Amino acid sequence: MANPAFVTAASQFGNSDTPYLSPQRISERLGVTLTELAKLAGVSRNTLTGKASARRVDAALSPLVRILASASEMSGDERRAAIWFKHQPIPGWGGKTAQDLVRQGDAEKVLEYLEAVRSGVYA
């Protein structure tokens, strides 16, 4: 079962009127444009903003939202999580940030790193 703090953090990225994630909310909270968010998610900007592709967009944005929600939960602050995501190199990845890894399709590695930090592997 998901941690209640994680569920609350993740819910901040959704639409209030639909069960889908909101690209606009995610881009605002992360401080990036929709075009930059589309590149991070690996979809076109048109796909990101089109209503017909909501499920595809959810699938593309879910790893990013999981990362941001987890980082927010751990840092206690959504803004610090966004700054960490964009600017803090992750140990062992040659100076790459979480944003760099997500952009190259390695969101799962970032999630594994966050889980390791949560478990006390990295201090």
What is the role of each PLM region?
Residues M1-A123:
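Non-transmembrane "mature" sequence context
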